């Protein structure tokens, strides 16, 4: 497989939209939505913290220094962007709670503010969030481009968007995934296990993005070409598809086609199941009740079947038989942005956008789908 970066396909077919977005505390805000309500009782204090100009790990170091506790005693659900105004929840042993108010000024000097204090019976762990609410301000937006943006947002609100990984995880030179492959092939290894795991996950992410882009390509071909042309295309690709199956695929109203054997998952979370009845699963996808998933390969990964597996095989690459303890999983191919709000201010040439995404999905994927900008940037937020 060619590991060089290729342009990732977009879901919708509009021309590129020109505007300026700066990932900064003024123009980009992220608010974490917790997975569960806090009980207001228990051995763990839970604080909602607002930060700017700090990564989550930098924030944890500040709490460790000021309160005199170990970083391992702090719990958090996910990493938040440094170049943004963000709120998130962190937990710490209850005995440190009295020190929080005493050190208010110390926190404020470090661009931190504690917004609320609660208690709970367990420590917050990675993944203990429902999702995030986002605010983005676009600048240098013309009225025509604002109108185009609204049209794209209508499509995203109706059909959703590709759940691409942002390119930040691939590194400044877009080569983290190549290092991950070298680790899997036992050609290199770093002293820090977390770095090895991160580089391997970069390789998994690269394969996922490539598979998702391939599926988008196939979906567009199914939609845009005749039955005869589709049969010829699949024949050339050595993919087993008959005319009845192709008719069923063309009848799906969603731009991303559900293939026989896709591993579906109840949305936004739930059990995995196989897509065997295309009409039924296509309707559930349109209703946002379930969505197809893509492979993050590994030793215990759940694989697709039938036609979906024939396509997926190309991206089952060197992980299954690797020495590395990479378990693998599935990730939604497609996600649905919710509570989309927008406002265009013509006199300022600014466009304000708000929306919610489930955990594991990135605002940069929505930005990519709106702009249709050529090439990749290094944003993952």
Give each language-model segment a name.
Residues 1-381:
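Non-catalytic, substrate/partner-engaging modules appended to enzymatic cores
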